[in-house]
Amino acid sequence: MITTVQEISKWRNLCFIRMQSRKWYPVLKKTPLVADGRKIIKHADKVPHPEEIIHPFYQPTAIEQFTACATEYNPSLLDGKKIAPSLIKHPVSLKTILVDSKLKFDDIRGVNRWLMEFVARRQHQRNIVLTPASKSVRSFHVLHLSSTDIAKLRGLENILSEIENTNDLQSRVESVNNELQNIFDRDSKQTRLFCEDILAYLIKNYGNSTEKLILLINVTEMQLFSRLDQMKAMNIILYHILCKVEANENPPYSPTLVTALENLLAAINNRFFPGRCENSLHPIVIEQLLSYFIKTGNLNESKNFLGHLIKKGILPEATIINRYLEAIDVHFDKSTKIFDIRSKFAFIADLAPIIENYGTIDLFKFLIPMCRHFDELCSLLNIIRKSNNAKQAVDSTLPIFIKKVLTFTKDPMINSGNLSTVFNIVSPIYGQNVPSEFVEKFILSFALQGNYTMMAHMIDTYKIKLSHKYQLQIIRALKNSERNHALKNTGAVGYNKEFKKYFIEKYLNCTEREALRP
């Protein structure tokens, strides 16, 4: 563990903290702490505990694990780059903070056990079974009001029918509340009326305008501390409120309505729980709240309710997940900045079981741009390869994968190797008969690396027809390669002048050849 709070105080003025490893984890050296402009001390680099890493899909391959366990000095994953999103304790404030960590150890001691814990955690996420929530709404039906009961509500109906705006809302709330009290006072000895049944009836039949719905939400909040004394009752009322919100308004919702509903939720928490009420809400109501918060752009609450559904073993609807991902992209403006990617990982950390077992094409497309290392990309591609809709998913995402491969490094030989790895992963999905449209994209990507050997190999193996238009695309790619890699790998096998000459003479027409002549 890290040093005690007393020791931290002792050494803070000297601007460093002596970090000690957990149990068997590799010992870490003294690391200087640098204060930024906001006087927040930068956390010392250290390997986080596997449970602190929130990456939802990275899984080191057997080769990565073997390499890490066989490297005596500074073994690492993800090349030791600071790209593993983690929730760790700040060494001074002890608050949980979101950081990008390095998976780089000082030496080989404890690496194997660390990997075992990390892989076991990923396996646990993989084994989580989620099922869609039951769509039965029978428990939310208002069944308890007879025609005689409804006749007793005439005074409430009259008050609601007179509401046209929110200017006198508070006085109307008091009027409704007083009338409710009168109803219960008149029938105190023989009534079978319950407050939740009355409110649910009124919301269902009179909550067709924003003003009336806000009034009924405020009345519900007032009744929380008198007649609404069970969460079962609140489930019924919340269900009907959220149905009306969905039916009445398109986002953006009225700020007054948003405030009223969120005040009601806060009051429910205060009334029944010291913290949050999710554990006692019906899954359908949780899905409704999740959908509502996504539409209002409240990502923090959306994440809370989404995570709660998953922890309860419930698979949210694909449309809700897609809207959640869209809301994240809107919030971060599809940014690929380091800080924004790290924050995005925090919002999708709970999706690990869904990514592993229930991933959709839209979800995979969202995740590809978030990869900052080729090994992450391979982990995601392997998940897709094992999914039930592997072929359809690869058909839709392979061009994005190919493009993404070339963003991790400018080294043409590494890029060529990575392209070959991706090709070898997806080939079995097509029974080795990869569609020519994808093979052509690989060829153009190899052309951008100046790899004449792989271009020739793929053209021959898959019998690609080189139309005039396609030859021009190859030539443009090769010219870009010569500009970008003019001083690199010119003598390497597959990249040198002899291979270039061979490729030009065998695969390009006479008119196209001249464009590549020195």
UniProtKB/Swiss-Prot annotation:
<dbReference type="GO" id="GO:0045182">
    <property type="term" value="F:translation regulator activity"/>
</dbReference>
<dbReference type="GO" id="GO:0005739">
    <property type="term" value="C:mitochondrion"/>
</dbReference>
<keyword id="KW-0809">Transit peptide</keyword>
<dbReference type="InterPro" id="IPR031467">
    <property type="entry name" value="Aep1"/>
</dbReference>
<comment type="function">
    <text>Required for translation of the mitochondrial OLI1 transcript encoding subunit 9 of mitochondrial ATP synthase.</text>
</comment>
<keyword id="KW-0496">Mitochondrion</keyword>
<keyword id="KW-0810">Translation regulation</keyword>
<feature type="transit peptide" description="Mitochondrion">
    <location>
        <begin position="1"/>
        <end position="19"/>
    </location>
</feature>
<dbReference type="Pfam" id="PF17049">
    <property type="entry name" value="AEP1"/>
</dbReference>
<protein>
    <recommendedName>
        <fullName>ATPase expression protein 1, mitochondrial</fullName>
    </recommendedName>
</protein>
<comment type="similarity">
    <text>Belongs to the AEP1 family.</text>
</comment>
